A protein has these predicted regions:
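Charged, terminal alpha-helix-loop-beta segments
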Residues: 1-180
Length: 180
């Protein structure tokens, strides 16, 4: 399933083969501890995929209803902290690394447009990669329902209706209309 998501966001080749080996573990809210750098210390990485057999990590920063945070220096973001952690940590610095920003917020995507270090992904791609598994697994079905409810909340008419309509139209055009 994870390989399907990577494929959906345009990741292929070596990464797909590596993920299909299934030698990795996933840590949610991976905590960066005991860093000498204030920028890194006690920060959290939303999803941290680690394969210690094949020496790779995948970092997924999840921004469903929030924006990428800048730190007090005004120059560095939490995305910079994630990258720096993977580069500087003795355990991971020689590992192959993939960074994914998961968000439907266009402002968040703009932070990574000029960087070759992060891959942008949105929740519609997650949803699309889950659809083929919903009949096989009740947990996936429940997650897909939850994700849909988060993406399309029941809002009052005077609350960001145009945003909701835009997301509905985008979802139909990019996901539903392409189902076979």
């Amino acid at each position: 399933m994870f390989a399907d998501f990577l494929k959906e966001i345009g990741i292929d080749g070596w990464w797909l083969k590596a993920v299909r080996k299934n030698d990795y573990r996933i840590e949610c809210e991976h905590c960066i501890k005991d860093s000498k750098e204030q920028l890194l210390n006690r920060k959290r990485i939303d999803l941290f995929f680690i394969d210690e057999v094949n020496n790779w990590v995948i970092v997924i920063e999840n921004k469903i209803n929030s924006e990428v945070r800048f730190y007090s220096d005004g120059k560095h973001t939490q995305l910079n902290a994630c990258q720096k952690y993977c580069r500087k940590n003795r355990k991971f610095r020689d590992y192959k690394t993939l960074h994914i920003l998961l968000s439907y917020n266009k402002k968040n995507a703009s932070y990574i447009e000029d960087s070759g270090d992060w891959q942008n992904a949105d929740y519609y791609q997650v949803f699309k990669s889950l659809l083929k598994y919903t009949l096989e697994d009740a947990i996936i079905t429940d997650y897909a329902k939850t994700l849909f409810a988060i993406l399309f909340p029941q809002k009052n008419l005077n609350e960001a209706v145009s945003d909701l309509l835009h997301r509905n139209a985008w979802f139909y055009h990019h996901v539903i209309s392409k189902l076979q």
